[in-house]
């Protein structure tokens, strides 16, 4: 079991919103010793991690060096781009029209590093990172699609979110952000035929053979409207009988341009959009966004806000896990637990609705706090739920999860090791099932999680379908422990920080100071202006690690909103985990991943 929290210095005593260059991070010294003191430009940010600009020619060498350090950076957590052309606050940074960033994580150090490469509009070429990290494949495809950077040596650089016939790169600043800026859409017969032809799967384009000397392979579409695909999701299977020789996941059917929307919504009005990223997570989705904005603004929230946010997050975690466990059991062949789960989930929705006024998508967290204080009687509703739920969990295990048929269908199926999980960017229960207890709430506490007593369930070395689902059951029990502590130790105090960037001033103050009233007017009419900087926040979401990487250029809107979701990485892993298995095993594997397509496609 790897549950290493040594060198836990990702969170220092200084406020999280301080701008730092992290020159004291050991990795900066290691890089300078190897490549020279002037090889890099270190960018001060509020991301909480070292941000290092490297030369394009050195990118692979630096990446390989970091991957082979004594305490290596073993996971490519995220990779994407930015259009720098309209950015005005770039003092001290290398000249760039576009940039690409690489976010790496070291488990042994519990530290991150972000590498950046500056690119000219006339030369958007850089080497592929897939030779070092296989999960760079999808990230580079999306970065090319959205910005136009070409990753030389990429095995299959093609569109991933948009239709194959799409023209342009949507996240460029000169690309329209509203539908009204396009010509009216018209689907002619010729265009329909073209689109249908473009969606035809051609095995040769993916390095697949249609046949061998002895047999022909069958190619089967699973989805995009298959009940076991859990959303608009298509997998093309290369089959030899019922055995899966290879497969190609096809995503993007649920893509809505969430990151583009972040560039034209105010910092405050983007909060409802976060709920729709992973539509089962509710307030869990809001947490990383508001924390990242609070870092930009320099806001420290009251203790009561922290505990309220934790309470709502754990309620939604339980809600999501219940749906996951019951639908997994249904995928294997048992129906009853689904009806059990919806009874239990209704109790959570009643509690959430009483507190926030909404059920699935509350949009209730605010920059600097929450929308309003807890209502009278919230504690009674929570206490009743905590008395009800533990016994129900026991019934799930007894009725279904200990069933020999279910275990026969899931034990040892779609198994992978810790090394494979890290290579593919797997987080959440999928990673912890391999024995690595990486839970952001414990390793990098946020919103006061360091004050709660709970355990991080881990597996015994190999992550298979059964281990993943049983870990979720234990995570439910730990969430109940956290909720009990919220009930017993809810602090008194305000439900919002008294900060000019988020909270209107008291009436008596506006009657005394005209500047206060002017500021209030501007904040309400245009929205708050966040200082020019970059911030980053990761959290332990319901399905793995979710993060927001925000860039402010000193405006009322985000210059760049990068949303990293766990499900995107998890679906990319499917071919490596399922090759050689049966189609029936694939159905069980899909059920064990715990994903929704909005979390994949954004």
Swiss-Prot record:
Gene3D superfamilies cross-referenced by the UniProt entry: Cytochrome-c3 Hydrogenase, chain B, NADH:ubiquinone oxidoreductase, 30kDa subunit
Top-level class of the enzyme under EC nomenclature: translocase
Pfam families recorded: Complex1_30kDa, Complex1_49kDa
Enzyme Commission number, as recorded: 7.1.1.-
Region ranges (NADH dehydrogenase I subunit C): 1-192
InterPro entries given in the database record: NADH_DH_suC, NADH_DH_suCD, NADH_Q_OxRdtase_suD, NADH_quin_OxRdtase_su_C/D-like, NADH_UbQ_OxRdtase_30kDa_su, NADH_UbQ_OxRdtase_49kDa_CS, NADH_UbQ_OxRdtase_CS, NDH1_su_D/H
Record's keyword annotation contains Cell membrane: yes
Keywords tagged on the record: Cell inner membrane, Cell membrane, Membrane, Multifunctional enzyme, NAD, Quinone, Translocase, Transport, Ubiquinone
UniProt-listed PROSITE patterns: COMPLEX1_30K, COMPLEX1_49K
Membrane topology according to the record: Peripheral membrane protein
Reactions this protein catalyses: a quinone + NADH + 5 H(+)(in) = a quinol + NAD(+) + 4 H(+)(out)
Region NADH dehydrogenase I subunit D: start-end pairs: 216-602
GO cellular component: NADH dehydrogenase complex; plasma membrane
Location in the cell: Cell inner membrane
SS bonds (residue pairs): none
GO molecular function: NAD binding; NADH dehydrogenase (ubiquinone) activity; NADH:ubiquinone reductase (non-electrogenic) activity; quinone binding
PANTHER family on file: NADH-QUINONE OXIDOREDUCTASE SUBUNIT C_D, NADH-UBIQUINONE OXIDOREDUCTASE 49 KDA SUBUNIT
Similarity remark: In the N-terminal section; belongs to the complex I 30 kDa subunit family.
Subunit field text: NDH-1 is composed of 13 different subunits. Subunits NuoB, CD, E, F, and G constitute the peripheral sector of the complex.
Role noted for this protein: NDH-1 shuttles electrons from NADH, via FMN and iron-sulfur (Fe-S) centers, to quinones in the respiratory chain. The immediate electron acceptor for the enzyme in this species is believed to be ubiquinone. Couples the redox reaction to proton translocation (for every two electrons transferred, four hydrogen ions are translocated across the cytoplasmic membrane), and thus conserves the redox energy in a proton gradient.
NCBIfam families xref list: NuoC_fam, NuoD, PRK06075.1, PRK11742.1
Name of the protein this chain belongs to: NADH-quinone oxidoreductase subunit C/D
Originating organism: Klebsiella pneumoniae (strain 342)
Gene: nuoC
